[in-house]
Amino acid sequence: MNTIYRLTFVLLTLSGLAYAQQSMEACPLHAQHQAEKAKAAHQAEVNQRGAQAMGFSQTKTTHHFRLYADGGAIEVTAKRAKDLASRQQIRQHLQEIAQAFANGDFAKPQHTHVQVPPGVAEMTQLKTEIAYRYEPLRRGGRVRLSTASPDARKAVHEFLRFQITDHQTGDSDAAQP
């Protein structure tokens, strides 16, 4: 008798799980929920690899990517004004990438995003036509990317638009004057 109860329990459990799976897939928001979960998982991975590549916590800092008529800017700031450690780490990182990018070295963004970001091949090829200038900010720093070359500017904008999307900053992808 005990075996019959166990078998009944197992059958009811399995049929309930099968019904729940069908119900989830029939839910009109299921695909949206799955996409949101995937986006959150991707962001967590970007943050983890970013912390490794950049040397500071991605959750204690804020990234902004600005597009300008002559190029753009990468800005990183500490969320808390008194977070001096993050501010120093940001400044060190931005000084390093300004020099690395000028040399055509985009290893850190490639590590962070597990791919060669759009625009990098062209930025590497046109590296002598792009100026990378580090500027300190009160809570961090900025790398200003500027060029007179239309091809280099297009590559810089592609690169920054990718950063906006992958870091989920919400920054405008339209060039400002």
Predicted regions mapped to residue ranges:
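Intrinsically disordered, low-complexity terminal tails/loops enriched in metal-binding residues
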Residues: G16-P177
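Bacterial N-terminal signal peptides
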Residues: T8-G16
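Bacterial N-terminal signal peptides that target proteins for export
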Residues: M1-T8
